[in-house]
Amino acid sequence: MKTQRDSPSLGRWSLVLLLLGLVMPLAIVAQVLSYQEAVLRAIDGINQRSSDANLYRLLDLDPRPTMDGDPDTPKPVSFTVKETVCPRTTQKSPEDCDFKEDGLVKRCVGTVILNQARDSFDISCDKDNRRFARLGNFFRKVKEKIGGGLKKVGQKIKDFLGNLVPRTAS
């Protein structure tokens, strides 16, 4: 009498299961997002949660910090988004939308997880006040240059007037 153990099909199934076991970890590794892909997914989430009328698109991504290799560990991110011309209700990808002229710019910081299966992020965005700070720096420099120039002009006038000697009639 023949048993199932002696059957050649059992050996084939064992081989198939072994191969599947070897291939599955490779499939899991393939589900790791790149740093930029994780940020773009986070922006999609920001757009879904936003109450603003238009979509936001990545304007500037800060350099990737050094990271460990674990895709399940939250990775720090910081980037800037800008308002686009596309309404939030559109089916377009934000990457296909033009930036809105004088659109709102937001600075975003937080963490993302690169494991695509977990698809997790914790990001907060605020109005980008850096351009106003730069504008303030510009006016301060202008004031310093004008103030310094006025001091020089004032000193030259004072020197000129000091060099004028009253003429005496002889």
Curated annotation (Swiss-Prot):
Proteolytically cleaved by proteinase PRTN3 into antibacterial peptide LL-37. Proteolytically cleaved by cathepsin CTSG and neutrophil elastase ELANE. This is Cathelicidin antimicrobial peptide. Residues 1-30 form the signal peptide. Residues 150-162 are annotated as: Active core. Residues 31-131 form a propeptide. Keywords: Antibiotic, Antimicrobial, Cleavage on pair of basic residues, Disulfide bond, Immunity, Innate immunity, Secreted, Signal. One of its GO terms (molecular function) is lipopolysaccharide binding. Pfam families: CAP18_C (PF12153), Cathelicidins (PF00666). InterPro entries: Cathelicidin-like, Cathelicidin_CS, Cathlecidin_C, Cystatin_sf. The cathelin-like domain (CLD), which is the propeptide part, does not seem to exhibit auto-inhibitory function, as it does not inhibit the antibacterial activity of antibacterial peptide LL-37. Gene3D superfamilies: 3.10.450.10. Belongs to the cathelicidin family. It comes from Papio papio (Guinea baboon).
